Amino acid sequence: MIDTLLQPFFYGYMFNAMWVSSLVGAICAFLSAYLMLKGWSLIGDALSHSIVPGVAGAYMLGLPFALGAFAAGGLAAGAMLFLNERSGLKEDTIIGLIFTSFFGLGLFMVSLSPTSVSVQTITMGNILAITPSDTLQLAIIGFVTLAILLVKWKDLMVTFFDESHARSIGLNPNVLKVVFFTLLSASCVAALQTVGAFLVIAMVVTPGATAYLLTDRFPRLLLLSVSIGALTSFVGAYLSFFIDGATGGLIVSFQTLLFLVAFIFAPKHGYMAARRRAAKALEAE
């Protein structure tokens, strides 16, 4: 029995998949907490689809996919920030514009050279088939992103809570926003290989949403979110060996399951807690 449970650890491709998935899950969850704080969840969705033309272009030119994806993600993030500052358009309009424009361009590029572009890898991911060079790319992206987040998490928290206060204590909110969107683009690049473009949004939203239901303190929310992201990603990759199912689908399914449990049973913000408060209010009347 124990030998069977430990079997995935004896295969190099599975070991790589598990630790890389955990790293990517933790980073996406770290950023997820800030997206929840600012109400920017849809920006994660826009970026996850905006990197598609970069990936398609990289495949067509024979370049590392991460290079093209990061360039496209950075361009999309910069375009959203620029339009938000200068156009006067509403945020959801800007997100929709960037999302559809970049994704449409990506699909057009795929149609130009369908044999050189792995559509399935772009849309669904394939963490079990990553090459050593891809693993190195993801490791570099992951550890650099995580290091910056650990150093700057307080500055980002202050900026996202109150930009005026951030300026008053010497921080530059615009620079920190650029840093955040750069890190978000990097995490979307990493998550693309893990779960694909269609499911990246789940990895940068669900852990933060789950943690939000469980605590009101932001440092604790960060810790819970990262733990949820790393654990569900590891378990999803691990169980995919036995179930023979899509790793990305399993990861997102576990994250959704934890969210539903928290939504129902969270001690303060859960559905059952709200029902109890409503019942007590009726009794008091």
Roles of regions detected by a PLM:
Residues 50-60, 97-109, 129-130, 173-178, ...:
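Small-residue-rich segments of transmembrane alpha-helices in multi-pass membrane proteins
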Residues 33-115, 211-223, 242-243:
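Short loop segments and helix-boundary regions at transmembrane helix junctions
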Residues 17-20, 66-73, 92-96, 139, ...:
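Loop-to-transmembrane alpha-helix initiation sites
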Residues 3-12, 26-37, 54-64, 156-165, ...:
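Short juxtamembrane and helix-loop transition motifs at transmembrane-helix boundaries
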Residues 135-207:
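Helix-loop-helix "hairpin" substructures at the membrane interface of multi-pass membrane proteins
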